[in-house]
Every structure is written in C-alpha cells, then in structure tokens.
A protein has these predicted regions:
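Residues that cap or flank secondary-structure elements
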Residues: 13, 31-32, 141
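Glycine-centered small-residue hotspots that permit tight backbone geometry or close packing
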Residues: 16-17, 133
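Surface-exposed charge patches
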Residues: 1-3, 23, 41-42, 151
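Pocket-lining segment of extracytoplasmic ligand-binding domains
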Residues: 19-114
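Conserved C-terminal helix/tail region of periplasmic/extracytoplasmic solute-binding proteins
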Residues: 147-184
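Ligand-binding cleft/hinge of the Venus flytrap
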Residues: 1-14, 44-48
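Glycine-rich, flexible loop/turn motifs
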Residues: 65, 72, 137, 161-164
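Secondary-structure end/capping motifs
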Residues: 78-160
Length: 184
C-alpha cells in the first residue's frame, strides 16, 4: 500500500518475528520494518535519535485490532464467569494505567524481575506504551474493529476472503463486562 501511495519499489524481505526484525534493523541489515510496540520501544531506547516511527497503525488505522485473547468456543460457553472475570480485570487494569501511568511504573518491578535496575528505561517504556494507546479502556474489541482488521488483511493479501465475524469471535462476554463497569 505505501509503495503504491509513494511510488517506490522496495526490496521485500521476509523476516519472521518482530524481535528478529528489530535486531536486523539495529544491526543495519535492513532499512525499515514493521515491529510491535515492545520492539519499537527497545529500538528507540537502544539507539536514541537514530530511528523514528514512520507509521503508527493505531493512528493510521483507528480501530484496527492488533492483538487479542483467544479461547476454545466450548471453554467460553462452559466458563462464562471465568472469561468475564478475566476481561473485567484486564479492562480495570487498562483504565487504571491509562488514568495513572505511575501505577504501572510502580507495579512492573513486582512482576518483571530486574526491570527496576534502570528506572529511567522503565519510565520510557511505560510512557511509550501509554502514548501508543496500547491498552484501550473499553477493550477495543467491536464488530466494527474486527471488520476493519479483516478488510485490511484481505487488502494486503494475508487473507484470501473475508472471514465472517460470527465464525471466529463472540462479543457477549465483553459486552456483559462493559455493561457492568460502564464504557469510557
């Protein structure tokens, strides 16, 4: 898409794994790449001022789903209370972090041993993730967002035909939680 928009012919190279692409970028083996937020932060911290974010999918494709939590349909049907408890816990944590990034800064060392060895780096990581709006306060999972994501995958050739939402997703647990805790 970008090559067509900006009329250039890139040399395409397939490198599996965001962390491997980040290392290839840092070592000068490639000039540009798509990497996940964790590796964006790592690259920016390892080489300050040498690399810049060219496109943020969150900005260019609002509503695009990047990640998700998956479970077998049978498990979801048999354990709705467990699924909803997990979703509620995640959303309340997302909201707390979005409202008060210092909360994550103080909690991260409890769960990530060694992370507090470099508090400035941890601060930059927290600020970057919050700045990238990684944690949507409402979960970011809607039929509309899913449709946009599937359409993009079809457009770029990752899917041959659109997958019908109902065949791979269920909104009921998310909607039940949002009904209880409210939407933001």
């Amino acid at each position: 898409m970008a090559a067509e928009t900006y009329e250039f012919e890139p040399e395409w190279v397939v490198i599996e794994g965001s962390e491997v692409r980040a290392e290839a970028l840092l070592s000068g083996q490639i000039d540009a790449t798509v990497i996940d937020y964790e590796n964006v932060v790592n690259v920016l911290l390892q080489a300050p001022g040498e690399y810049h974010v060219l496109i943020s999918f969150a900005d260019q494709f609002p509503g695009l789903m990047g990640n998700g939590f998956f479970a077998r349909a049978g498990y979801i049907e048999e354990n709705p209370e467990v699924i909803e408890a997990m979703i509620e816990s995640l959303l309340l944590t997302y909201r707390r972090v979005n409202d008060d990034p210092d909360y994550l800064f103080t909690q991260a060392p409890k769960f990530l041993p060694g992370i507090n060895e470099d508090p400035e780096k941890l601060r930059q990581i927290v600020d970057a993730y919050v700045g990238f709006n990684v944690w949507d306060s409402n979960g970011g999972f809607t039929a509309e967002a899913a449709g946009l994501t599937v359409d993009l995958y079809v457009e770029v050739g990752d899917l041959e035909v659109p997958a019908e939402f109902e065949t791979w997703a269920v909104l009921e647990p998310m909607n039940n939680v949002l009904e209880r805790i409210g939407r933001r």
